[in-house]
Amino acid sequence: MFVRTAGERDLDAIRAVLVETWHATYDAIYGAAKVTEITDEWHSIASLKARLIKPNSDFLVADDGKRIGGVAFAESIDGGKLVVLRQLYVLPSLQGRGIGGMLLDEIIESFPEAQAIRLEVEAQNTRAIAFYEANGFVRSGDTGERTGTFGEPTLVYRRPLAG
């Protein structure tokens, strides 16, 4: 797999990665119907297309030349000092092979002036939490409000960068 910038031709494959990964991660916890409702809204082609042109952001895919195996999207805020990782997903069948780390490294390299990277993660997504902690993220709090994907507080993680 190699990491590259996502393009409009990738949108169907990106959506497929997101839908499959979300169902694999959340169906047992929240139910397939709720997950489908969310992926239909958040991962629609129109929503994904808007991310391609969002200023101060980077949208990446992990590609082996035959298929998209992972996606990542992040944007900088606070004058470029902070990167917010909005999405990092790898197909379940490809997890544990370093693809997530490759995507994360490339996201960080895309924002050389950033001093930190921040993300929010569902408290029940223990696999993602373990991944982020193994990659230097430290829990810095939670949203404190029922704003998460499923109406629950999300955990906030942060990692300092060289900047």
What residues fall within each predicted segment?
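Extreme N-terminal starter segment of soluble prokaryotic enzymes
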Residues: M1-V3
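Acetyl-CoA-dependent GNAT
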Residues: T5-R9, R15-Q95, G101-S110, T143-E145, ...
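Intrinsic disorder/low-complexity detector
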Residues: D12, G65-K66, R127, F137
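C-terminal "cap" of GNAT-fold acetyltransferases
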Residues: R51, A116-I129, A134-G163
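A structural feature recognizing the 12-helix transmembrane core of secondary solute carriers
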Residues: I99-F111, A116-I117, Q124, A128
